């Protein structure tokens, strides 16, 4: 949403140099903060409880700007070597930082139920969050304390502005950027991930750059998803990253960890060379 809002004027032939500069300077932490604030406003009107981890990366020139809330991870791989790995953001083992809609207190649960019972309508398709109808006037006294975006002083919330990990990394053409959820890193060790990347690239001739750009990222993401799923589903697996971390915390755990798995892969391309991704 931040990118869309900041760059929408670029489609206008009357766009200014200021608009171009603002788009180029877009910060992923600010992007996550603005998106989260919008979600908070919309969720309070809907009475929705929930939370999510998030990792955002923006490529500007030769600089990759990264912001992370939680246990997603970004790899930057160059010439077959892992040169950067973003750090997970955790409160404690298996308790990542998250972007929450509301805190899980009795008051917020009661509020969400009340909002659901007193809504005058559902969110219309394509509506903007600031245009959504509020709850009935009969509920206004009860919810006035919640009718704002929470600040960092509100203890139950993690916020991108104050809590996100953020990095700026220089990239080169043909670098591989790999972004994945904890479902991958809880089930595959970094060495196993790198072995998979090497194996996929080994099937492409060094002279066939176009084919590598076109197919390698998809093959890598699909294969990693399948491997992570196989660890989850195989009762014979004797060790996984999640098991190792659990054991280090004094917990008994064997095998992989069931979870959803999301893997995105992309190759950095020179601006003058068309990139199929």
Question: Where is each model-derived feature located?
Answer:
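PP2C/PPM-type serine/threonine phosphatase catalytic domain
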Residues: 4-277
């Amino acid at each position: 949403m931040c990118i869309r809002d900041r760059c929408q004027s670029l489609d206008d032939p009357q766009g200014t140099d200021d608009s171009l500069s603002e788009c180029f300077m877009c910060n992923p932490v600010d992007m996550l903060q603005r998106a989260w604030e919008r979600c908070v406003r919309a969720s309070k009107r809907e009475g929705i409880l929930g939370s999510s981890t998030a990792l955002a990366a923006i490529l500007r020139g030769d600089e990759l700007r990264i912001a992370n809330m939680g246990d997603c991870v970004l790899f930057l791989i160059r010439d077959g070597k892992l040169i950067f790995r973003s750090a997970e953001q955790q409160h404690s083992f298996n308790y990542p930082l998250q972007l929450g809609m509301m805190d899980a207190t009795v008051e917020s649960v009661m509020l969400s139920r009340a909002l659901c019972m007193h809504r005058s309508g559902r969110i219309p398709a394509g509506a903007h969050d600031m245009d959504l109808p509020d709850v009935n006037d009969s509920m206004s006294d009860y919810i006035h304390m919640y009718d704002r975006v929470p600040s960092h002083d509100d203890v139950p919330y993690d916020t991108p502005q104050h809590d996100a990990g953020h990095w700026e990394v220089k990239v080169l053409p043909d670098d591989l950027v790999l972004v994945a959820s904890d479902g991958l890193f809880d089930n595959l060790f970094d060495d196993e991930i790198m072995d998979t990347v090497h194996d996929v690239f080994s099937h492409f001739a060094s002279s066939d750059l176009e084919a590598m750009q076109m197919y390698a990222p998809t093959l890598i993401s699909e294969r990693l998803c399948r491997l992570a799923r196989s660890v989850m589903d195989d009762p014979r697996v004797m060790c996984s990253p999640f098991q190792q971390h659990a054991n280090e915390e004094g917990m008994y755990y064997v095998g992989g960890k069931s979870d959803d798995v999301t893997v995105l892969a992309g190759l950095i391309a020179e601006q003058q060379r068309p990139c199929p991704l």
